Amino acid sequence: MKLSKAKLLIGDKSSESKIILLIGDYEAPKTEVVLDAIKKDGSSYCYFYTEGVYDGELSDTLTNLDADCTLQSINEVVSDNDNLEGILVVDSLSAFPDNNISRIRRLTTICRDKDLTLICTMHKGRITPIDTSLAVLFDAIYYL
């Protein structure tokens, strides 16, 4: 499934709007595709972590978390939002440049504890063996 045609809003669209927590660098390849898909899908609100300041069209609906994104800050956002439905990791290599599997395992634990869906994007041209070990930790993966 192509991400641009995918429904990124997780959960029942007829219920209250959902919050999606995005983790990643907005300058990473294809992140614009992800943001455009969210805009088309009509998601009214989501959090966004980036190493820079995003000032695109969706800046009024994206809350920029601190640049030093930690699992603790992710856990706080998850704990503070009852209508959070899932976490989307934009480009796992950019979001976790050290490919630290233990960090992603802890993120997976946060999602399981809160009954959240964990999905990510990966790039077809940059698949590495470490990516395949990470793949089993996600509920869904979109290859761009």
What residue ranges belong to the model's regions?
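Conserved P-loop
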Residues: S14-E76
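Conserved nucleotide-binding/hydrolysis micro-motifs of P-loop NTPases
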Residues: S17, E51-D55, S94-A95, K124-T128
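Substrate-engagement module of ASCE P-loop NTPases
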Residues: N100-I127
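Phosphate-binding/switch region of NTP-binding enzymes
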Residues: M122-L144
